[in-house]
Amino acid sequence: MIQQAIAKLLEGEDLTRAEAALVMTEIADGGATPAQSGAFLAALRMKGETVDEIAGAADVMRQRADRVRVDRDVFIDTCGTGGDGRHTFNISTTAAFVAAGAGVCVAKHGNRAVSSRSGSADVLAALGVNVDADKETVERCIEEVGIGFLFAVRLHPAFKAIAGVRRELGVRTIFNLLGPLANPAGARHQVLGVYEARWVPVLGGVLAALGAAHAFVVHGEGLDEIAVTGMTHVCEVRDGQVERYTIRPEDLGLPRRDAAELVGGDAVANARIVTDVLEGQAGGPRDAVLANAAAALVCAGAAKDLRDGVARAARSIDSGAAREKLRQLVAATTVPA
């Protein structure tokens, strides 16, 4: 199938959702050579990935994931694409603890850094979380603590082989979009930041096709986050309905911040910023976390709108609840000596 798909893409033709799924299955099963996989990814990138193509690929990634069981009707993910090149601290990871502190169950999907200096796995490890915890421990964390980290590299074994091809290509491919769409626990409520504004409506359409219950796809001022530095493009998906709009920090009751306030460093430096935010330190990093945690609370049904979400997120931090969730996750994943 992959040879036919490559030929079709080179003619500028789109693949159906089923065709994209067949090719991804072939790649996952080891039926495609590295040259074929690379040609497919490059041809698809050159043509431009469609909603159906991304949805078909995501179908297979979800099916092949090592499934994490979550015994909750509503739980969220705050995994974004990364790759925005702005080197901010780990905003969505911090927002996950704030959401958990506000009573929302979180199955946080993530990975180590690819283009940044600190991915979610890197900063969590620097904070003392054992990101390599086995699946049973992760499930227990989600159930007992209310938050767990789903390490992508451990839970998507079928796609380890493609990592080398992606590295050798050295350009963004469909895989840069697939991570947030393939939560191994099957989260249907999520905040998904994308690295370019053009992907906001596309991934909104993909999430609708994949059956998202309530999700936000966002890109703000060059960030794969809701921005407190200017305008954010939003695609809100709710039970198959898609709504597009823009928001500004003032709409959330937050001041406009300078982008320089949000710049992080390596995992250790970012862990310090995360800790400062969770300990209640005021400033740009806190406001960025409040904005993104607010969206997480809205999609989980724990806040009526984004302004209400900001207020609830602030209480999660100021009460110490968010910081306590981090402490509990560290304790729950620590291997006894």
From Swiss-Prot:
Give me the reactions it catalyses. N-(5-phospho-beta-D-ribosyl)anthranilate + diphosphate = 5-phospho-alpha-D-ribose 1-diphosphate + anthranilate
Give the species this sequence originates from.
Anaeromyxobacter dehalogenans (strain 2CP-1 / ATCC BAA-258)
**Entry EC number(s):** 2.4.2.18
Tell me which cofactor or cofactors this protein depends on.
Answer: Mg(2+)
Cofactor mode of binding and number, as noted: Binds 2 magnesium ions per monomer.
This chain belongs to which protein, by name? Anthranilate phosphoribosyltransferase
| NCBIfam families reported for this sequence | trpD
Please tell me where Mg(2+) 2 binds in this chain.
D224, E225
GO BP terms: namely: L-tryptophan biosynthetic process
